[in-house]
């Protein structure tokens, strides 16, 4: 059994991260072929990195996602001193130089990340670590992102973090999904548990 959660699909194209730890023994070409065979994808776009400190080892849905055919949302920061900047800039370069399976240039919508979000002492003391999870120490950075939302029939459920960027994230989703109601949901507790 191979782990393949590090992909996001838009019907005719797939975006993926090259995380060899998730698929030991398979080459990038073999993973690409499997994604095409099993998902019916015509093209795979490999991104060099994911969200900084993402403990899931590279779930692309916390970093980059298709929001419409030919349109990709990407986690972004303007802070060049933030380790996320290099990761997002590298992905932006790949995405802007890539055509989709229909030969169209990708439209990339950047959405500023929250934070950085760090764990408080109180939160650290309140987390019961279980086998296979990372410890939660006060001051540790969490991999918060607005990209990892749920898009359903008539609705988009969007994690928010009581952050100055929350309002812009809601506005971006409202613009991109005019036929859906955008529902902001506090995401910090989920983030503390290793998700988003």
Descriptions of predicted regions:
Residues 1, 16-196:
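The feature marks the mature, well-folded catalytic cores of soluble enzymes
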Residues 2-15:
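Single conserved hydrophobic/aromatic residue that forms the stacking wall/gate
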